[in-house]
């Protein structure tokens, strides 16, 4: 959690994290005044919506989000931006007018499809870019034990057993899925 260095973290982790979003963003902006700055926020985090909205208030250019399906990220970003512009008045079309880029982390065709369809249906928007994390990335990717075995990523010697060509087929499917929504929204959606 971003606020773990704050002496008050153990008493009030939420407040420590919200304050740290601003202080870390300020430090990063001093280092890179013209750079693109963002936050990687886990969708499985207990206060996910609050953290996303606070990152927008801090001035984030992009929110990258995985560790679960960030299906409501567009809502949190658009509402935070609308409140910055208009106070508590949420006008129609706020999801199409956002400035903060949205970048979900996906590991499968299915996760890319769920996110893109949900964002399209609920918020009339699509990702600005998509990050792929494969079975060797570790972390919170949601691969089943069977999938890890299929990709050869379930052993201590992954560098020898990993079946890159098998996962590359999944990557091609993710790119194809994202392209459908890029075409629909008439915009480029890089897949990283």
What are these regions (language model features)?
Residues 1-185:
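Active-site entrance/lid segments in N-terminal catalytic domains of soluble metabolic enzymes
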Residues 187-192:
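Glycine-rich adenosine-cofactor-binding loop
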């Amino acid at each position: 959690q971003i606020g773990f260095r704050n002496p008050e973290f153990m008493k009030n982790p939420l407040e420590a994290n919200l304050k740290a979003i601003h202080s870390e963003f300020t430090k990063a902006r001093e280092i890179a005044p013209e750079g693109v700055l963002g936050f990687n926020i886990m969708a499985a985090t207990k206060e996910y919506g609050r953290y996303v909205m606070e990152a927008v208030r801090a001035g984030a250019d992009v929110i990258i989000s995985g560790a679960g399906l960030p299906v409501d990220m567009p809502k949190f970003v658009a509402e935070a931006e609308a409140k910055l512009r208009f106070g508590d008045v949420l006008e129609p079309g706020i999801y199409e007018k956002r400035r903060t880029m949205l970048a979900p982390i996906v590991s499968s065709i299915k996760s890319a499809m769920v996110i893109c369809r949900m964002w399209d249906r609920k918020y009339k928007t699509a990702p600005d870019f998509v990050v792929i994390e494969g079975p060797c990335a570790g972390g919170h990717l949601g691969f089943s034990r069977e999938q890890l075995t299929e990709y050869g990523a379930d052993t201590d010697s992954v560098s020898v057993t990993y079946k890159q060509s098998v996962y590359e087929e999944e990557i091609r499917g993710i790119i194809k899925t994202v392209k459908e929504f890029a075409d629909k929204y008439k915009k480029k959606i890089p897949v990283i």
